[in-house]
């Protein structure tokens, strides 16, 4: 058996040396080391050996098998290297050809506008607060001075999931939750960006889903002049130093007094044109002083603390800032539209 093993080893190594292709090496591996090969056959016959011969012959079989396996791996490596070198010798790359340009993406215009608005208010000391889009009726309405029988609920058609659960119609619900969670009942200064949902028919100026950004400030001795000054800073940062604002009386259940804010038309600079319908002004947001009932429901003493709030649609701001005439452009995923907003 020992002589046969030496003969197998010598023959296998000779065949490996003679092989010129990977296929030939694979044939040698199968023939000598495969399940039906002579090495395996020798291993099966080990049981017939005496106890004294078995360890020595076992070691010899392993030595022969490892020698064949090692030589196979070396030869395979050499052949693979030779194949690569042959390809490199015959294949060339023309490095003078111009490279293919890589298409770069860009911020969605709504994302860009929301980030700009956040930056403006963060610069004034505000924090960004977020909340759930699926909201309880209480935080969306009742905590904001809108009880179940309040007629102002008709101002917003709502997507109800259950009798007490809905898709939020504004991010004011985040303000209500923030005030309630503030156990110290101290100052608050937040903006609340997020998606909101209303049962509107989609057209050039309306969408059943849109982005809203609301702001809330609660502190002692807060006045209407603080609200006006804050909005003036925001408008000049977003639309330019030459923009003017005006506040008109309005009604919102959660603020008293309530106002709507207009800015001087950027197309005609207040002279009157088709964009502003000849008025020289364009409405962009609603605001007001936080209603005492809202403060009291959140646990604040309305005689000690006051506040102001405001809310705007990100699409409305983006349409005015970029001259977009149809809100649906923001949601159609038209690359031709989106590519206009690539940053240099």
Swiss-Prot record:
Its cofactor is Mg(2+). Keywords: Aminoacyl-tRNA synthetase, ATP-binding, Cytoplasm, Ligase, Magnesium, Metal-binding, Nucleotide-binding, Protein biosynthesis. It is found in: Cytoplasm. GO terms for cellular component: cytoplasm. Its EC number is 6.1.1.20. It is an enzyme of class 6 (ligase). Binds 2 magnesium ions per tetramer. GO terms for molecular function: ATP binding; catalytic activity, acting on a protein; magnesium ion binding; phenylalanine-tRNA ligase activity; transferase activity; tRNA binding. InterPro entries: aa-tRNA-synth_II, aa-tRNA-synth_II/BPL/LPL, Phe-tRNA-synth_IIc_asu, Phe-tRNA_ligase_II_N, Phe_tRNA_ligase_alpha1_bac, Phenylalanyl-tRNA_Synthase, tRNA-bd_arm. Its main location: cytoplasm. Mg(2+) binds at residue 256. Transmembrane segments: none annotated. One of its GO terms (biological process) is phenylalanyl-tRNA aminoacylation. It catalyses: tRNA(Phe) + L-phenylalanine + ATP = L-phenylalanyl-tRNA(Phe) + AMP + diphosphate + H(+). Belongs to the class-II aminoacyl-tRNA synthetase family. Phe-tRNA synthetase alpha subunit type 1 subfamily. PANTHER family: PHENYLALANINE--TRNA LIGASE, MITOCHONDRIAL (PTHR11538:SF41), PHENYLALANYL-TRNA SYNTHETASE (PTHR11538). Tetramer of two alpha and two beta subunits. This is Phenylalanine--tRNA ligase alpha subunit. The lineage of its organism: Bacteria, Bacillati, Bacillota, Bacilli, Bacillales. The gene is pheS.
